[in-house]
Regions:
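Long, contiguous binding/interaction regions
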Residues: 2-57, 61-98
């Protein structure tokens, strides 16, 4: 059975994809999946369409409908709940490797 999951994804994007020029970053993601591994596989395949690479996922869990995730993520969850094919990407926070 699939549920809506939430994760924090660390992603490598192509040079020039972000205004900062940075190629590493992270974002919150919501999507339907049947397991942690299913989420990882589906998200990797989705990002590959943009030639982006999933580096890691963290804080991955089925959403808790009683928890307030904040305005942006709550909206992402609502949109994901309405569309079982949805993959919602939150704000991308880029960084430079140290």
């Amino acid at each position: 059975m699939e549920n809506v999951w939430i994760t924090t994804a660390e992603i490598q994007v192509q040079p020039g994809d972000m205004p900062s020029g940075d190629t590493l970053g992270f974002m919150r993601v919501t999507m339907w999946a049947s397991s942690h591994d299913d989420l990882h596989q589906k998200l990797s395949a989705y990002l590959a369409k943009y030639q982006w690479r999933l580096i890691s996922i963290d804080r991955t869990a089925v959403i808790d409908s009683s928890f307030d995730y904040g305005d942006e993520v709550n909206q992402m969850i609502d949109e994901t709940l309405r569309d079982q094919n949805a993959i919602r990407l939150g704000t991308y926070y880029s960084y430079k490797p140290s």
